[in-house]
Amino acid sequence: MECREITEGSTTFTAPVQDETTQFPPGSAPVFYNTKMEFNRDMTVLLTKIVQPEDYLDAMAATGVRGLRIANEAKIPVTINDRDEQAVKIIKYNAEKLGGDISVTCDDANRLMCTSRFDSIDLDPFGTPVPFLDAASRAAKHYLFVTATDTAPLCGAHFKAGCRRYFATPRNTEYHAEVGLRMMMGTMARELVKYDRGMKPILSYAKSHYFRSHVRVLGKVTAADETLAQIGFVMQCPKCLYREEQKGSLYPKMHICPHCGVETVPVGPLWMGPLQEKEILAEMQTALAELQFGTKRQMEKMLTFLLAEPETCTYYDYHIISRNMKVSPPNMEELIASLNEAGYYTTRTHFCDTGIKTTAPLPLIEEKIRLWNAKNLQM
């Protein structure tokens, strides 16, 4: 196969050449290298440099670039696994060339995780991570990192597929990006609590075609109970933008929308707890200033968003609110400022360019939009 030399971060490796004219992903080469996931890898490398797990498993590695970078840039022992023999040949070639404490295995990911344990496990499959979560929930000692690229089922666009895979009810709401991330994390939490284990999210986000979450795995029964208490539902009005959060419930409690008088519908179960460990994100932000990554500007922007966002479980798209009100959308910064001045913490959100995360109720947001229109669009 035709290969080329590539550098990501401070790591140089060899990867197969992809035919960019064919469907991508999964690409045309025998072994897949996804250039579009460099940001994902950069963020994980930076996080791993901060938390320093004892070791790391790249469970479905393909070219192995993620594990190679962790070994080279975070300087911890790494196991890189793939069940494809051609992939393993490339990984071994790169590992020998790179040096460092790297073990390479050719095995089914579930079988490997059923027979070995690792301090940190990274699941980055093509599609859903669900088939691997059970084994990973038992095999990960302290850290579990998970990517899902099946965004349509998680966001509710492919409703039945989302129900089947995640045993949850997705809804294609205006805040569907956060629903998708929280539904994936809710599934992670439910897998862990089965084994009397809990989780504490460190770094979680949505970007383009995937969701990504890095969590601490906690081994005590009390942690499992605390994790279970963070599972819940968003109850959404099917006729308007009203929603309410229900945390700590394994079944949804129906309510009547105070605006429309119709019964709300459940979204979930979802992870309703914090998405970030902001002390770690602050350390990442400080460290990033002295480091070089190919996606450094994107990383800086993402960390700034994540550090600022309030811990609400949904966001509002103020363009959709304005459209429903049949008025012009206000200037975003002026809307945010007016809500903060009213005593409700409000920021932009990484989930949506026209989204705001706020502790304010919907009627107040509508009032601020109406006032802005009255002030700025007078004839």
UniProtKB/Swiss-Prot annotation:
Compositional bias (Polar residues): 8-25
Annotated Trm1 methyltransferase domain residues: 4-369
Annotated spans, Disordered: 1-26
Any Pfam family matching the protein: TRM
Catalytic activity as recorded in UniProt: guanosine(26) in tRNA + 2 S-adenosyl-L-methionine = N(2)-dimethylguanosine(26) in tRNA + 2 S-adenosyl-L-homocysteine + 2 H(+)
EC number: 2.1.1.216
Entry binding sites for Zn(2+): C237, C240, C257, C260
An individual GO BP term: tRNA N2-guanine methylation
Protein family membership: Belongs to the class I-like SAM-binding methyltransferase superfamily. Trm1 family.
Record-linked HAMAP family: tRNA_dimethyltr_TRM1
Name the record gives this protein: tRNA (guanine(26)-N(2))-dimethyltransferase
Gene coding for it: trm1
